[in-house]
Amino acid sequence: MLAPRNTETGVHMSQTEADLALRPSPSLTSMGPTRLGPPPRRVRRFSGKAEPRPRSSRPSRRSSVDLGLLSSWSQPASLLPEPPDPPDSAGPMRSPPSNSKEHPEGTWTGAAPVKAADSACPELTVSSGGPGSREPPRVPDAAARERRREQEEKEDTETQAVATSPDGRYLKFDIEIGRGSFKTVYRGLDTDTTVEVAWCELQTRKLSRAERQRFSEEVEMLKGLQHPNIVRFYDSWKSVLRGQVCIVLVTELMTSGTLKTYLRRFREMKPRVLQRWSRQILRGLHFLHSRVPPILHRDLKCDNVFITGPSGSVKIGDLGLATLKRASFAKSVIGTPEFMAPEMYEEKYDEAVDVYAFGMCMLEMATSEYPYSECQNAAQIYRKVTSGTKPNSFYKVKMPEVKEIIEGCIRTDKNERFTIQDLLTHAFFREERGVHVELAEEDDGEKPGLKLWLRMEDARRGGRPRDNQAIEFLFQLGRDAAEEVAQEMVALGLVCEADYQPVARAVRERVAAIQRKREKLRKARELEVLPPDSGPPPATVSMTPGPPSAFPPEPEEPEADQHQSFLFRHASYSSTTSDCETDGYLSSSGFLDASDPALQPPGGMPSSPAEPHLCLPSGFALSIPRSGPGSDFSPGDSYASDAASGLSDMGEGGQMRKNPVKTLRRRPRSRLRVTSVSDQSDRVVECQLQTHNSKMVTFRFDLDGDSPEEIAAAMVYNEFILPSERDGFLSRIREIIQRVETLLKRDAGPSEATEDALSPQEEPAAMPALPGPSDAELQRSISPEQRSWAAFSTSPSSPGTPLSPGTPFSPGTPPVFPCPIFPITSPSCHPYPFSQVSSNPCPQAPSSLLPSSSGASQVPFPSPSLPTSSPLPFSPSYPQVPLHPASLPTCPSPPPLPSTTAAPLLSLASAFSLAVMTVAQSLLSPSPGLLSQSPPAPPGPLPSMPLPLASCDQESLSAQTAETENEASRNPAQPLLGDARLAPISEEGKPQLVGRFQVTSSKEPAEPPLQPASPTLSRSLKLPTPQLTSESSDTEDSAAGGPETREALAESDRAAEGLGVAIDEEKDEGKEPQIGGSSPILSQPSPVWMNYSYSSLCLSSEESESSGEDEEFWAELQNLRQKHLSEVEALQTLQKKEIEDLYSRLGKQPPPGIVAPAAMLSCRQRRLSKGSFPTSRRNSLQRSDLPGPGIMRRNSLSGSSTGSQEQRASKGVTFAGDVGRM
């Protein structure tokens, strides 16, 4: 027991000694009495919690530092003999061990390191430390709480919306996810769908108001775009951000980065990934370009192609921002130079710029190198791009297929680049769906049925299709659908239902590829057929339009360079074609107005109001005197003069053409047309310009605010017109402004126009002698809201009489129109024929029922279209046709017109058909008295009415006209003017030059004397029914009705007012023309196709020289004509039947005269200019006019004449004796 005590005592003593050594104040002797009572308790308190922390911790720290020293001191003290202690001191010395049971042994020695550790880890002292021991852990706890508080505040900030859309649907959070040069993108939320969106703020402070408005309109257009490869546009609005106006776009949120970030991360793109993503980009571009109007991205690059994480597909983004970027930074960098096509620098671009940018994107994806990275600045890039130098990275492309595609996309000439459709059908981008469709037999390009093979890949044979296990099927173009064929295969068990979509897609793509190939071959053939530019195009393929199954796209042929002022315009306002007419403009009255330059004398030859005007209800006979080439003026010159074009290279006025080759010269030049006129708020005219490089530019100008000089300067600056064309463009714009102002004034006072229509004598005097577009051309472009009353067709009327808004109009109801009024003036004073014909009903009742088939108006009897909107259209080969003194009643006031006069001024109630124009090559008669042999047009039955004749005897006119008709009817088999054919010209006789046209006259029959006839013509006029079936005619009519007898024809002829140049030719059978009304020339000719006699339908001297005497050419033309006749007839019959079925299904009664859409399509007529056009465009430009009800017209302007009366009768077309005959 003593040893432990000694040990414990030794330990205790060593501790005490240590304390004493550290504390120099008290001695050991003085400590004895102090340890009698309280010291042990103090020792216990020292080990307990009573002592303050400084006293308890200080020894602990010191013992830990001096542990080794204290241990060394305690060891010798235990070995030395102890001095004798007082007996009373043993108790206190032993008291600590007695109390040491509460604390384990070694509390002071062994606990010393523990306390040292506690000093390093304060949290361990909490269990035994004093009150101050909680302080050290409180410091890190506060920092953690601060961090948690900041995190919560940040989360609250991020989840709290800082802005909302005007409708409250979209929320903006203050989380920036992207920033560009002019935009900042934040995270947003669609509260309706709870889908995150991208909130884009676009700075527009540098934009003008017009540019801002334009961009807003583009964004509005982009909202409706939904495609899997297009970033969705949800909404947009204007907002004010920090006092600045900005545009906010809400788009689909793309969180997986862009192609640019992908290339930075992976550097190299695998071929299959390149193929798949490139195909998806192409699909997105194809979707944009197939919109109407096409949407151009204009800033396509890898930074704007986003990747969707879940599906791994790509989407094209930043749509519509290129315009804004160009406007904002026009003075620095326009777009992204590395991806900009050469034409982008000129700001003249189309869909091809996106193809160029796509090629650069593919180049970057294939090489992971930025295009033109070798260039130091944008100027070097510009020089390389415009010079056609490819970037250096192009030569690093390893895959030949990819290199070929890139090369085809980045060509300098945009016309040589691939199209999106070409790229989608390229083998590299073709999807492997395990289904292959191929032709079972070679395609000849003609058969409507395709024999195809469907092969399915066999997984057991390495993906190769099985041999001799193809499914052969027949696909009818235009009738079968790929989905229907695939469904039939599924129903028959040939393919499984899971393969329905791949099979349908494969069939659809193969058929589309075959059709594209056929179209290319067809165009190539047409280009081969086209003659050289030295001469006019022959009337071959250009006159054989295909069956008009649907409205074709508008051909790009504006009118600024129309080198002939046609006297006849298209006057159709049917609801089907009113918004898609090409150039058939109308005046407010629907016909040529008095201010039409085609009806005016040239400059320096003013019209004389004192000249008497002979009012002819339907027509009058004309003599055909021989006219030598030395005549001062010819109708050919008048007809072909380019008064309507400010850019004309033709002579003005009555000057004769010195160089006929110059007339039909072709060169690239701008063409201008008026598309719309609006006077709702501002008087705005919209025009369409075809530039010298065949680009279409649509522009508008204010009649009051814009000057022609400013417009011309802008056009020259933008290189839309050449500087050499500026003067012509200026004059053209001035003429358009004058015509539009005249038209708008006339529209403002229709009642005045109606009053003016009653006085035809005053009208020609007011005609300004200004060449330019006629008011008739501008009328069609008047907006429908201003022309709600304009849905009428061409019909005779007094001039300037507008159709009242309440006038009912339907295709089957024949409107009642007054007879046309024609001023007959002296040829010496009026080289241009006048026409005061209007298509609107005159308020007066003395009007005859003159039906018209132009537009939608139909006549209830078998009569071809009889529009009266044109005077006599003189074809290039048409001879001069002055009035014969004996053929028409002469008035006391006008001097007699000698037969030797070279330029008679004629205005007929209806223009001659193309048959007359083409036959006119042989119409030049040697004697001036040939009028009696010209059969007048047999008019239709008209109610009795007084015929207004200006200072002329109506009875004498009727008598003389009837005499002519009797004479003509008595010689039905006698050839009128010989065998007249369009080409080859095989008539005998020396060709003579009429104006600038070479005309050959063959036979000159004797001139029979005129015989008196009954004057009953004035009481019963019959409607002229021109059955025009010459080479140029497109009116092979088939009507319900039996053939007319010769007597009925003669009676019909006697009722005419003497249109004397009625000739019909029968080229196919080689027959002589029948005089007894075999091809009576219309007093109401078909309005539209007469326009084409000048440029392509009749042989002028140039055409004769260039085209030659090729018989095979015309034989082929005849075959094409017959083919198209049958196709159009079948189509029109089918469409008419479908319309009747539709009416029956709707429970309505079909209207009396149903016109099939194919027939209405023929109203889309435009005048042909001298410009060089491919044959396909000429096909689309030449379509016949609407036939009358019951008349089935063939839409072919080509072929030979088959116009004998017997042939017409065999085709069911008759000249009705009265209105009710059908």
UniProtKB/Swiss-Prot annotation:
One of its GO terms (biological process) is regulation of blood pressure. This is Serine/threonine-protein kinase WNK4. Autophosphorylated at Ser-328 and Ser-332, promoting its activation. Phosphorylated by WNK1 and WNK3. Phosphorylated at Ser-572 in a MAP3K15/ASK3-dependent process in response to osmotic stress or hypotonic low-chloride stimulation. Ubiquitinated by the BCR(KLHL3) complex, leading to its degradation. Also ubiquitinated by the BCR(KLHL2) complex. Serine/threonine-protein kinase component of the WNK4-SPAK/OSR1 kinase cascade, which acts as a key regulator of ion transport in the distal nephron and blood pressure. The WNK4-SPAK/OSR1 kinase cascade is composed of WNK4, which mediates phosphorylation and activation of downstream kinases OXSR1/OSR1 and STK39/SPAK. Following activation, OXSR1/OSR1 and STK39/SPAK catalyze phosphorylation of ion cotransporters, such as SLC12A1/NKCC2, SLC12A2/NKCC1, SLC12A3/NCC, SLC12A5/KCC2 or SLC12A6/KCC3, regulating their activity. It is an enzyme of class 2 (transferase). The gene is Wnk4. GO terms for cellular component: bicellular tight junction; cell body; cytoplasm; cytosol; membrane; protein-containing complex. Its cofactor is Mg(2+). Gene3D superfamilies: Phosphatidylinositol 3-kinase Catalytic Subunit, Chain A, domain 1, Phosphorylase Kinase, domain 1, Transferase(Phosphotransferase) domain 1. Interacts with the C-terminal region of KCNJ1. Interacts with WNK1 and WNK3. Interacts with KLHL3. Residues 554-564 are annotated as: Interaction with KLHL3.
